[in-house]
Structure formats: structure tokens, C-alpha cells
């Protein structure tokens, strides 16, 4: 079987209006993919930046996949949340990005969005916080049910991902 | 004796902890160590180091230059657990006690070549107001008992941090027998090496 190593970091996020941010992340793959070692989901620390407006998480990712096919190439999905001084959490953005398919080092910028909801919900979010969230997290990385949503832009999550491929040339796959 | 089918690959890292930007602090020193997986073992060089105390430059850069060498070689059979360098920066507080001014970690670049990395440095924060007050009153900041936790992904959801500086690292990476073991590391990149050699405020 061909092997893929995904080694890198969720560096941080820019462009969010909230200041104390953290990120829940996960990786979704097709049925032909098997995770040999590493954790496929996690949550970063909460960062309150003192200089500049970028929140830094430096969250390490180290995953080792074996695959029998190319279908279902890994997708990273992200949820950015903000935490206020009382420890309450509010959704700031959803986003996903495909793990790059060429070996080497990649800088990824993942744009995010959040559901808007009705005008009542928007008004409530502006005054008391909270706001609508997705019931099914798979909407983040699948395109199937998106057409029903009305969304607003969030900030951008920055990732530095290195990719190592093994035995792809043995099967004639050019990445 | 060059074996026809090697089972081990080597990763040689040279480089330096070049400089740092900490707008609020001065007279800092830096410790580094490496964190790596079970299949990895160092074969040569030093995997820990502690730098001199550097003061800020008296110019617009306000740079803390350490110019501290890194030279280590690892061997492994599996890229999982690829080495990360963990940095911790310390400096004196108003009473002259050494307190931590930042932790940071980054993976050693995967592909051979020359790489520059600017890594954000953060300190843990007290979670409760009472702890905040006592740490302010006693003049003791929260610290990690083992700095190596910053290289781990698990258990982070309980920590709150404050990022307050950057350290610039330079790596020269050489690998041996990765190709023979069937790994494709991609093209040799020199990402971020071009351009000025000292950090220019906040990297994006």
C-alpha cells in the first residue's frame, strides 16, 4: 500500500474580530484510507495575542496514512471558536481544506464562514452572543447540503503542512 | 559497506537560533531541545542547548541576536514522530528572577535544503482570577514543568496562552536514504530564506 505522512502545524488565524481564539480540527478520509498512527482530531490552546492581531496556536499535526486508492484524499476540517472572559465559547468560523497532493512543504490559508441564520438569530448574536451552529459537522467538508445555508465570512486559518509520500511511484501515480 | 536495501534513514540538521523579537522584554536567553517519536534516535551532535543572554540592539530592529548553533543528526525507520525543536525563552523580571517569556515549537523541515522559520512564542496564562492575582502578587508566572508539552497536540484544550514574541530559526536539512526507502520528499525548497535576515515585526 502507498503511504502518506502529513506533518505540520496549525499555525494560527487572522481576520477574526474576536480576540481569544481556539480551533477544533479533524481530518476526514475516504474508506480506502487507514490511519496507522497519530490522532485524527484535536483542539488547540486558546491564544490571546499581545502583539499584532494574529492568534497563534502552533498546534502540531503528525499523521501516518496507508491507502489503497486515491479516492477520498484527506481533508482537514476546522472550527474556530472564540472564548470570552467568562469562559463562554462562541462559534467564529467553519472551514476545510484538502491536504495538498504534492510532496513537500505547503503554506495553506483556509478561509472560514459561519451560518447567519434568521434576522432574529443575527440580532440575538449581536447582543447576547451564541448564534447558530451546524448540527452535522460533515457539512463543513462535504458539498452536499450547503445550498440550504446562508453564511457570512469569518477570518482565515493558516497552516504549514509538510507531505511525504511513499511508494506512489510503484503504482504509477504521479503526485 | 553500503547496504543495498537500507532500513534506516538519516536526518542531519544544522542551523542556528538566529534572533528574536520580544517588544516588551529585554535580556533574554533561549533553551532548545528536540522532541521526537519512538522510532527516532539521535546519532550525533547535541540535542539540547542553552544560549547566552542577549540584549536588544540599539536600533530600529530592536532585535535580540543569539546566533546560537544547532547541529544534530537523527536516525529513524519511520517518519512518524518527525523531530520538533522546542524553544523556551527566559529573562529576568523586575526582581531579577528568571521567568519564562515564551515557549514555541516547530517541526524540522521535511525536505532537504535551507529553510528559515519564524515561530511564535507564547506563555501559559492562569485560568482563574484568584490564580491571576496570586501569581501577580507573588511575582511568579505560570510555567510548564516540562517545556516538551508544547510539541504535543493532546490535552491542549485546557490551556490558555498569550503570544508575545517571535524567534527566527535557520535550518539546513540533509537526508540520507529516504529515496531508497521509497519516500518522496518533494522538490528542494528554500522557503523564506530570501529576503532580510531579521524578523520584520509580525510574519503573516
From Swiss-Prot, chain A:
Keywords: Cell projection, Cilium, Cilium biogenesis/degradation, Cytoplasm, Cytoskeleton, Nucleus. InterPro entries: C2_B9-type_dom (IPR010796). The keyword ATP-binding does not apply. Residues 2-118 form the C2 B9-type domain. It is found in: Cytoplasm, Cytoskeleton, Cilium basal body; Cytoplasm, Cytoskeleton, Cilium axoneme; Nucleus. Disruption phenotype: Mice expressing reduced levels of the protein in the central nervous system and kidney develop perinatal triventricular hydrocephaly, polycystic kidney disease, lack functional intact cilia and die at the time of weaning. One of its GO terms (biological process) is cilium assembly. Highest expression in thymus and skeletal muscle. Also expressed in spleen, kidney, lung, heart, microglia and liver. Detected in brain (at protein level). GO terms for molecular function: gamma-tubulin binding. The keyword Nucleus applies. GO terms for cellular component: centrosome; ciliary basal body; cytoplasm; membrane; MKS complex; nucleus. Component of the tectonic-like complex, a complex localized at the transition zone of primary cilia and acting as a barrier that prevents diffusion of transmembrane proteins between the cilia and plasma membranes. Belongs to the B9D family. PANTHER family: B9 DOMAIN-CONTAINING, B9 DOMAIN-CONTAINING PROTEIN 2. Part of the tectonic-like complex (also named B9 complex). Interacts with TUBG1. This is B9 domain-containing protein 2.
Swiss-Prot record, chain B:
It comes from the Eukaryota. It is found in: Cytoplasm, Cytoskeleton, Cilium basal body. GO terms for biological process: camera-type eye development; cilium assembly; embryonic digit morphogenesis; in utero embryonic development; neuroepithelial cell differentiation; regulation of protein localization; smoothened signaling pathway; vasculature development. Disruption phenotype: Mice display impaired cilia formation associated with renal cystic dysplasia, as well as ductal plate malformation of the liver and polydactyly. Additional phenotypes, occurring at varying frequencies, include randomized heart looping, holoprosencephaly, microphthalmia, cleft palate, ventricular septal defect and thinning of the myocardial wall. Depending on their genetic background, mutant mice die between 14.5 dpc and P1. GO terms for cellular component: centrosome; ciliary basal body; ciliary transition zone; cytoplasm; membrane; MKS complex. Coiled coil: none annotated. PROSITE patterns: C2_B9 (PS51381). Residues 9-127 form the C2 B9-type domain. GO terms for molecular function: hedgehog receptor activity. Its main location: cytoplasm. It holds the Pfam family B9-C2. Keywords: Cell projection, Cilium, Cilium biogenesis/degradation, Cytoplasm, Cytoskeleton. Belongs to the B9D family. Part of the tectonic-like complex (also named B9 complex). Component of the tectonic-like complex, a complex localized at the transition zone of primary cilia and acting as a barrier that prevents diffusion of transmembrane proteins between the cilia and plasma membranes. Required for ciliogenesis and sonic hedgehog/SHH signaling. This is B9 domain-containing protein 1. It comes from Mus musculus.
Amino acid at each position: 500500500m502507498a503511504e502518506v505522512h502529513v506533518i505540520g502545524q496549525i499555525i494560527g488565524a487572522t481576520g477574526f474580530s474576536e480576540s481569544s481564539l481556539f480551533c477544533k480540527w479533524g481530518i476526514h478520509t475516504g474508506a480506502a484510507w487507514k490511519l496507522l498512527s497519530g490522532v485524527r482530531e484535536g483542539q488547540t490552546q486558546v491564544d490571546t495575542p499581545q502583539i499584532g492581531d494574529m492568534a497563534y496556536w502552533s498546534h502540531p499535526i503528525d499523521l501516518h496514512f496507508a491507502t489503497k486508492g486515491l479516492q477520498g484524499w484527506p481533508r482537514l476540517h476546522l472550527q474556530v471558536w472564540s472564548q470570552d472572559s467568562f469562559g463562554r465559547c462562541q462559534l467564529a468560523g467553519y472551514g476545510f481544506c484538502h491536504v495538498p497532493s504534492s510532496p513537500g512543504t505547503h503554506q495553506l490559508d483556509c478561509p472560514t464562514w459561519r451560518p447567519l441564520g434568521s434576522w432574529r438569530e443575527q440580532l440575538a448574536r449581536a447582543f447576547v452572543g451564541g448564534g447558530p451552529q451546524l448540527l452535522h459537522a460533515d457539512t463543513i467538508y462535504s458539498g452536499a447540503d450547503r445550498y440550504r445555508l446562508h453564511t457570512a465570512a469569518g477570518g482565515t486559518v493558516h497552516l504549514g503542512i509538510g507531505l511525504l509520500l511513499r511508494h506512489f511511484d510503484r503504482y504509477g501515480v504521479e503526485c | 559497506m553500503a547496504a543495498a536495501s537500507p532500513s534506516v534513514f538519516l536526518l542531519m540538521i544544522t542551523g542556528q537560533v538566529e534572533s528574536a523579537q520580544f517588544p516588551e522584554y529585554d535580556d533574554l536567553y533561549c533553551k532548545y531541545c528536540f522532541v521526537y517519536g519512538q522510532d527516532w534516535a539521535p546519532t550525533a551532535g547535541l540535542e539540547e542547548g542553552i544560549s547566552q543572554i542577549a540584549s536588544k540592539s540599539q536600533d530600529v530592529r530592536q532585535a535580540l541576536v543569539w546566533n546560537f548553533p544547532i547541529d544534530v543528526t537523527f536516525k529513524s525507520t519511520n517518519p512518524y514522530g518527525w523531530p520538533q525543536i522546542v524553544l523556551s525563552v527566559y529573562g529576568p523580571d523586575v526582581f531579577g528572577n528568571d521567568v519564562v517569556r515564551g515557549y514555541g515549537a516547530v517541526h524540522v523541515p521535511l525536505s532537504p535544503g535551507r529553510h528559515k522559520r519564524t515561530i511564535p512564542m507564547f506563555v501559559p496564562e492562569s485560568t482563574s482570577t484568584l490564580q491571576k492575582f496570586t501569581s501577580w502578587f507573588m511575582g511568579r508566572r505560570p510555567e510548564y514543568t516540562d517545556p516538551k508539552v508544547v510539541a504535543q497536540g493532546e490535552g491542549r484544550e485546557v490551556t490558555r496562552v498569550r503570544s508575545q514574541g517571535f524567534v527566527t530559526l535557520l535550518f539546513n536539512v540533509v537526508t540520507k536514504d529516504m529515496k531508497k526507502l521509497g519516500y518522496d520528499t518533494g522538490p528542494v525548497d528554500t522557503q523564506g530564506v530570501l529576503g532580510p535576515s531579521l524578523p520584520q515585526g509580525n510574519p503573516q
